[in-house]
């Protein structure tokens, strides 16, 4: 809409949108008269605001053509490579001593069955020969200041040495951590209860001919294995034990990984009974249903737990030949009570946020209720954070597989390349501004502002050479949140495009009796 206004020769910010689709026609389908009245008042309010709009210019800042990528897993590697191949300098920071992340331990990736290590090694080799990528291992990002186009990031090595880097944008590819069950959660802590990542690593690394007991690292024979889904994911208060946090989200990749591990166990050890205990199986991506079918065809037995119940893991009585019992009801057999004797239990643990709290605090990138980094919009702006110039990639923004991780990384890199393609970065002008004639330098705005460097006190010379303090807004650092407007005792601060006077004009238009167009329309609709 603003581009259309601009093509007509007007300032693009002399435009006000009256949203009568979502706010009226979709919300009040069954009340035409009231909907028409509401639409009329919304239009009245938009007209009232439009009458007081002022021409605005975009905020422009010189761009540093260098990007900081935080995280050396598949997503970080992919983002760094894409940027370098577009001719942009990259600083790639990884807190551990090597690149690759969790993917290194994956014995097989879906659907190609390529080992995770082979996939990662290709990316690492490409990064190693790319002259535009500066890799910093064993390094943390301890502080970030500045704004899009001109950030300052403080990097600290494990030896304690600090170095400041000038960068134009940041891609957070900080990854995830595996959920670690609480002691006793589904029997965790017993040497015969393993997490899925630990079991997979041992299974795919095992030499041919090894028995399952030696692969799992347990004493005695392993004749029966139970895989338990949704450990640390889809948790319900009152039903699930937690390890300090209730994780209500689905980790998405666990089901496919679990049924593939179960099928692989059957393939390698055909004499072992394998039972898959689940509430729901979500092999969600294209062609991944084939993994479920392959597991079923290999002889894996499936037991479905009622959604409002949980399977129970118990130590078997001493006289039993099996050390562990899994008790549950099975929906597939019409609620039959089952007691499954097993030698080994594998817990399909989910993903939890990557533990980059210090970095998140430094960048002020918001997180969702699940603790993962929050995108602006999952469909329209899926790799952008609410902080301009801070992009998200991979599992930093939520559980996903390697294909999705690298795809989001490429999307984030493309966004950065577009952002820093010119010598200047342009930003919307909806930022705070101060009227010096009303400001009395109380400092309330500084205390309320959540963004470092957005407001400062400056010396201003007034009549007769007198120097006084006045608030000053840095339009590049300001995000237009309006916190300063709310606390200023003198009304000296407004936000461009959303001034107090404009709000009042809209309220008057909505509540005033002069809303004749709406009244007339209401009468016309009622008469039909």
Task: Write out the residue ranges for each language-model feature.
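Residues forming the flavin
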Residues: 1-528
């Amino acid at each position: 809409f603003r581009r259309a206004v601009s093509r007509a020769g007007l300032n693009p910010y002399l435009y006000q949108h009256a949203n009568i689709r979502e706010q009226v026609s979709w919300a009040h389908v069954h009340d035409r008269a009231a909907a028409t009245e509401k639409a009329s008042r919304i239009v009245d309010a938009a007209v009232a605001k439009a009458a007081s709009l002022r021409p605005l210019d975009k905020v422009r800042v010189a761009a540093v053509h260098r990007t900081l990528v935080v995280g050396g897993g598949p997503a970080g590697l992919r983002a760094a490579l894409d940027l370098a191949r577009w001719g942009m300098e990259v600083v790639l920071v990884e807190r551990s001593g090597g690149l690759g992340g969790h993917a290194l331990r994956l014995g097989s990736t879906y659907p190609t069955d390529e080992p995770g290590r082979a996939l990662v090694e290709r990316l690492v080799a490409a990064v190693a020969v790319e002259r535009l990528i500066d890799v910093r291992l064993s390094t943390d990002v301890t502080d970030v200041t500045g704004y899009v186009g001109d950030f300052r990031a403080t990097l600290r090595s494990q030896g304690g040495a600090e170095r400041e880097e000038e960068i134009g944008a940041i891609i957070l590819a900080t990854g995830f951590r595996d959920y670690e069950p609480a002691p006793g959660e589904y029997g965790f802590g017993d040497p015969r209860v393993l997490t899925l990542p630990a079991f997979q690593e041992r299974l795919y690394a095992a030499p041919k001919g090894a028995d399952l007991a030696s692969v799992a690292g347990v004493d005695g024979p392993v004749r029966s294995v139970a895989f338990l889904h949704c450990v640390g994911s889809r948790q319900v208060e009152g039903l699930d034990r937690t390890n300090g946090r209730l994780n209500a989200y689905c980790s998405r990749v666990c089901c496919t990984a679990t049924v593939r591990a179960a099928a692989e166990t059957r393939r390698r050890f055909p004499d072992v009974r394998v039972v898959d205990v689940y509430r729901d199986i979500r092999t969600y991506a294209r062609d991944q249903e084939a993994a479920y079918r392959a597991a079923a065809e290999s002889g894996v037995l499936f037991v479905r737990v009622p959604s409002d119940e949980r399977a129970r893991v118990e130590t078997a009585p001493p006289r039993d030949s099996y050390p562990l019992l899994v008790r549950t009801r099975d929906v597939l057999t019409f609620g039959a009570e089952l007691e499954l004797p097993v030698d080994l239990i594998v817990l399909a643990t989910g993903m939890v946020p990557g533990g980059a709290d210090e970095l998140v605090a430094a960048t002020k990138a918001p997180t969702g209720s699940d603790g993962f980094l929050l995108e602006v919009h999952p469909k329209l702006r899926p790799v952008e954070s609410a902080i301009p110039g801070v992009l998200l990639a991979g599992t930093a923004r939520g559980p996903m597989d390697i294909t999705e991780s690298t795809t989001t990384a490429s999307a984030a890199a493309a966004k950065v390349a577009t952002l820093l393609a010119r010598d200047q970065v342009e930003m919307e002008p909806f930022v705070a501004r101060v009227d010096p004639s009303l400001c009395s330098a109380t400092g309330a705005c500084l205390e309320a502002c959540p963004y470092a460097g957005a407001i400062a006190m400056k010396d201003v010379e007034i009549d007769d050479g007198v120097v006084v303090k006045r608030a000053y807004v840095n339009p590049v650092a300001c995000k237009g949140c309006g916190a300063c407007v709310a606390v200023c005792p003198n009304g000296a601060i407004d936000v461009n495009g959303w001034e107090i006077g404009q709000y009042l004009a809209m309220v008057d238009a909505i509540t005033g009796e002069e809303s004749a167009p709406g009244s007339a329309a209401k009468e016309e609709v009622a008469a039909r």
